[in-house]
From Swiss-Prot:
<dbReference type="InterPro" id="IPR050281">
    <property type="entry name" value="Flavin_monoamine_oxidase"/>
</dbReference>
<keyword id="KW-0560">Oxidoreductase</keyword>
<comment type="subunit">
    <text>Monomer.</text>
</comment>
<keyword id="KW-0614">Plasmid</keyword>
<protein>
    <recommendedName>
        <fullName>4-methylaminobutanoate oxidase (methylamine-forming)</fullName>
        <ecNumber>1.5.3.21</ecNumber>
    </recommendedName>
</protein>
<dbReference type="Pfam" id="PF01593">
    <property type="entry name" value="Amino_oxidase"/>
</dbReference>
<feature type="binding site">
    <location>
        <position position="33"/>
    </location>
    <ligand>
        <name>FAD</name>
    </ligand>
</feature>
<feature type="binding site">
    <location>
        <position position="31"/>
    </location>
    <ligand>
        <name>FAD</name>
    </ligand>
</feature>
<dbReference type="GO" id="GO:0016491">
    <property type="term" value="F:oxidoreductase activity"/>
</dbReference>
<comment type="similarity">
    <text>Belongs to the flavin monoamine oxidase family.</text>
</comment>
<comment type="pathway">
    <text>Alkaloid degradation; nicotine degradation.</text>
</comment>
<feature type="binding site">
    <location>
        <position position="379"/>
    </location>
    <ligand>
        <name>FAD</name>
    </ligand>
</feature>
<dbReference type="InterPro" id="IPR036188">
    <property type="entry name" value="FAD/NAD-bd_sf"/>
</dbReference>
<feature type="binding site">
    <location>
        <position position="39"/>
    </location>
    <ligand>
        <name>FAD</name>
    </ligand>
</feature>
<dbReference type="InterPro" id="IPR002937">
    <property type="entry name" value="Amino_oxidase"/>
</dbReference>
<dbReference type="GO" id="GO:0019608">
    <property type="term" value="P:nicotine catabolic process"/>
</dbReference>
<keyword id="KW-0285">Flavoprotein</keyword>
Length: 421
């Protein structure tokens, strides 16, 4: 049995820990927060109609989330159809531009890119479109909101994921997405140590890893670093690395996003409306009761949008703009807004990751290649589901598989040395 340290109890870390624990390995999970889940964070919002679950972090479960669905089934959890589509958003602050127009332009962009293999940035692709500037900007807004980075930085490949433009269904976990990490952590029991901030990680010359936290120092056979991108880039942590890994990390972009939740006086219909100017979208969705929750949800993406909104100093302005955008909804004048700005979360340093041009399968593999006995997991390293809950889970499970292979190799070497003796 190996002794394995897992740094971070987000979905990546918990996925790795779960797979290793099921294989009989001895795992210890260090989590700086007082809860599991990381950027998966469910809470309740009081409304005139009662209290309703909201997602302050990761929200939508989409097509292709096979690993997440398997874990949900394993832990007896279910999904709820939101009744609206993550992919289709009606522009609410443009004149003469409809969702159908954006869909058509997005498909034109993908056709233009088909011969080039989606090389370059999304902005370079947008510059080739013959459409009116206002329509191109609406598509640009769609890209920047969803990737949470600038179109001038993110790879044009991002359009393949966000610009499906088909009204595919979207789901959430019944009772809140937080229920999955809660269940996974509960199954691990005392192996999860909360309030433990990692300060240093060091490979030991003759094998093993030294991990220093606020409270003690521990030695492990292997360690899985499942921390957010901004945290692993923190020079103060001084994680083991290589030149190849550092080069690969340069192609990973830190996304910045914020969420807003407002109570509603009446029960609305499902909806999805985007602000092109503000780089945010709003939605109302069905919950586990089968009815539409009286909550307006909003998500703002990209560093420039967050900076312009100045949410820390002027949070009420976003509320006012959302109210002006959604005149179809009954938002109380004294509505108690709940704003979450992930850039201000010191344990996250931002929302999720996106990829810059030049990212390859080999490059993302480098992000997960172990450095000594230190292994890596996180949504930022996932080639297909970057930035998503599914990507975090897949990455964590891959890390667990690599750790088990390493432990088998070490065990085989030890047996061989004993036989020679």
């Amino acid at each position: 049995m190996g002794r394995i340290g897992i740094l971070g109890a987000g979905l990546a870390g918990l996925a790795a820990a779960t797979k290793l624990a099921e294989a009989g390995e001895n795992v210890t999970v260090f989590e700086a927060r007082n809860r599991p889940g990381g950027r998966v964070w469910s809470e309740t919002l009081d409304t005139p109609k009662g209290s309703y679950v909201i997602e302050r972090g990761a929200e939508f479960v989409l097509d292709g989330y096979t690993s997440m669905r398997r874990l949900l089934s394993q832990f007896g959890l279910s999904l709820v159809d939101t009744g609206m589509s993550y992919y289709v958003r009606e522009p609410g602050d443009t004149t003469g531009i409809t969702c159908d127009d954006i869909i058509r332009t997005g498909r034109e962009a993908l056709e233009l890119a088909s011969g080039s293999g989606l090389q370059g940035t999304a902005e370079e692709l947008l510059a080739k479109l013959p459409d009116e500037p206002e329509l191109v900007d609406a598509l640009r807004a769609r890209i920047e909101i969803s990737t949470a980075v600038s179109a001038s930085e993110v790879t044009a490949r991002s359009l393949q994921h966000i610009a499906s433009f088909e009204p595919k269904p979207s789901w959430r976990v019944a009772g809140g997405n937080q229920r999955l990490p809660d269940a996974m952590a509960a199954a691990l029991g005392s192996a999860v140590r909360y309030g433990e901030t990692v300060r240093a990680v060091e490979n030991i010359s003759d094998g093993g890893v030294l991990v220093t936290t606020d409270t003690d120092t521990s030695v492990f056979d292997t360690v899985v670093v499942a921390l957010p991108l901004a945290v692993i880039r923190d020079s103060q942590l001084n994680l083991p690395t290589t030149e190849a890994r550092d080069a690969a990390l340069k192609h990973v972009l830190q996304g910045h996003a914020a969420k807003l939740h407002l109570p509603l006086e009446t029960q609305p219909a499902t909806s999805a409306v985007m602000s092109v100017e503000g780089r945010y979208w709003t939605w109302t969705a069905t919950d586990e009761s089968g009815a539409v929750a009286p909550v307006l949800n909003a998500f703002m993406g990209s560093p420039s949008a967050i900076t312009r909104a100045n949410l820390k100093q002027r949070p009420a302005e976003w509320v006012a703009k959302a109210r002006a955008l959604r005149t179809d909804l009954a938002i109380p004048q004294d509505a108690a807004a709940l704003t979450t700005v992930w850039s201000e979360d010191q344990l996250a340093g931002g929302a999720y990751a996106a990829h810059a041009p030049g990212v390859t399968a080999a490059g993302t593999a480098l992000l997960e290649k172990p450095v000594g006995d230190v292994f890596w997991a996180g949504e930022y390293s996932e080639p297909e589901f970057v930035g998503l809950m599914e990507g975090a889970i897949r990455s964590g499970e891959r890390a667990a598989g690599r750790v088990m292979q390493r432990l088998e190799t070490k065990s085989g070497n030890s047996d061989s040395e004993r036989s020679k003796a």
